[in-house]
Regions:
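Conserved glycine-centered beta->alpha loop in an early N-terminal alpha/beta scaffold
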Residues: 3-198
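P-loop NTPase catalytic core of nucleic-acid-dependent motor ATPases
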Residues: 165-252
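AAA+/P-loop NTPase substrate/partner-engagement loops
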Residues: 244-278, 282-285
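Conserved catalytic/switch belt of AAA+ P-loop NTPases
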Residues: 292-304
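Conserved Walker
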Residues: 301-316, 330-336
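Structural recognition of the conserved hydrophobic beta-strand(s) that form the central parallel beta-sheet
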Residues: 320-327
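Conserved P-loop NTPase catalytic core
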Residues: 333-385
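Conserved small/polar residues in nucleotide/adenosyl-binding loops
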Residues: 393-400
Length: 400
């Protein structure tokens, strides 16, 4: 009998909500006894003498159950969901395969409420893997990045992924804030009538909005990452515009500052993958940093790095658009102006007319967001072959 991912996830949630402190399956050779914390797990040591009772060796008060196996469609790596009760409170941990097969790695989970010591870790490892073999966890295919992954397009929106055979799986708290910022409110009609109508005649704003939407098409047309920036000495409207064009995908929390490390920019670009990145205010960034960041980002791949196993980490790739703001243009800030300018589209004209009504527009895009981007990409997907043929037909030949 086949089950959908939704049916599987609902069953997992129902099991997690049950008021029981004992897993459904306990392997032979183990025993669970109730205590003031809920329950405790013991290993049964058979007696060697007739008539002598078996011994019970304590293992843990947080009896783990491995109920879900996550299979990464991109690299084949697996991880697991570990469920247990800590002082009668349910706990769910995303754990790596290494953490539940190596006693030293398992010990690190003590900081995440697992009751384990150096004396019990190896026994708990044995128990976990016996349980997993005799009661295999449900397998779910997952992606750990957004956008184009293998033959799938991974949305950050829960309702868009409900019927997908692949689920988004994230273990990073920093990225979780980004995921939570991808959400929608209102309707496409509301966005059109209350937001789009107010900006459709503003060229600089519309270029930024088109870049925000167009980011998800770079993979489709095999275009390398690039940056679109709104620059100018005036303080009017740059950050406002960045928040505005982020609203096609979600809330203003999608906007982050340039005050971050190159590694964090690279990690965010890799995670967003196809979706745009919004970076505000280059003012406090050094010319050397901005040049290196532009080159690293526009290369579309992470740097090669060695790991603790003395091997090379797998490179991550991305194809998206970064939208940026700053008083000085990135091109003028960088020492290598020619090299950087080939990777940056700079908009320096005033984005809004004098006495523009920012207050009402700010209210509208904070109340209506996250609808245009979804519908834009759905429309493209519905007729992608026609759109690609049209682009090939209208593109100039190499001789032109």
């Amino acid at each position: 009998m086949n089950f959908t991912n939704d049916e599987i996830m609902n069953e997992i949630k129902e099991n997690m909500n049950k008021k029981t402190y004992t897993p459904d399956f306990i392997p032979d050779g183990y025993k669970v006894k109730p205590n003031s914390y809920g329950a405790a797990l013991y290993q049964i040591i058979p007696s060697r003498k007739d008539g002598e009772p078996d011994k019970e060796r304590f293992i843990t008060t947080t009896i783990p159950e491995i109920n879900t196996r996550y299979e990464n469609i991109e690299n084949g790596e697996v991880s697991y969901n570990m469920h247990f009760f800590d002082n009668r409170t349910p706990v769910n941990l995303n754990v790596t395969a290494e953490e539940i097969t190596d006693s030293k790695q398992l010990l690190k989970l003590v900081n995440r409420k697992l009751d384990v010591t150096s004396n019990t870790s190896s026994k708990l490892i044995d128990y976990i893997n016996q349980s997993k073999r005799y009661s295999p966890p449900i397998n779910i295919k997952v992606a750990t990045r957004l956008g184009h992954v293998k033959d799938y397009f991974i949305y950050p929106y829960k309702d868009q992924m409900e019927n997908s055979n692949v689920k988004l799986h994230n273990n990073d708290r920093g990225f979780q804030k980004l995921i939570n910022s991808f959400k929608s409110k209102g309707t496409l009609s509301d966005y059109s009538e209350k937001v789009f109508v107010k900006i459709k005649d503003l060229p600089m704003v519309m270029v930024m909005l088109y870049a925000s939407l167009g980011s998800v098409l770079l993979y489709e047309f095999d275009i390398m990452p690039f940056i679109v920036e709104l620059a100018g000495s005036t303080s009017t409207g740059k950050t406002f515009t960045l928040n505005l064009v982020a609203s096609v995908w979600g809330t203003t929390d999608l906007t982050t500052t340039w005050s971050s490390t190159r590694n964090s920019i690279e990690a965010m670009a890799s995670f967003l993958n196809s979706f745009p990145m919004f970076k505000d205010d280059t003012r406090n960034i050094s010319p050397n940093f901005i040049a290196n960041a532009v080159y690293n980002y526009s290369s579309g791949e992470s740097k090669s790095r060695s790991n603790k196993n003395l091997t090379i980490d797998e490179k991550k790739e991305w194809k998206n658009i970064m939208l940026s703001t700053g008083e000085a243009s990135i091109t003028n800030m960088a020492e290598d102006k020619a090299g950087v300018s080939a990777r940056v589209v700079t908009l320096e004209e005033q984005p809004y007319p004098d006495n523009y009504d920012f207050i009402s527009l700010d209210h509208e895009f904070r109340e209506n967001y996250g609808t245009l981007g979804i519908e834009f990409f759905k429309q493209y997907q519905s007729k992608k072959d026609k759109y690609k043929d049209c682009l090939l037909y209208t593109s100039p030949s190499p001789r032109d």
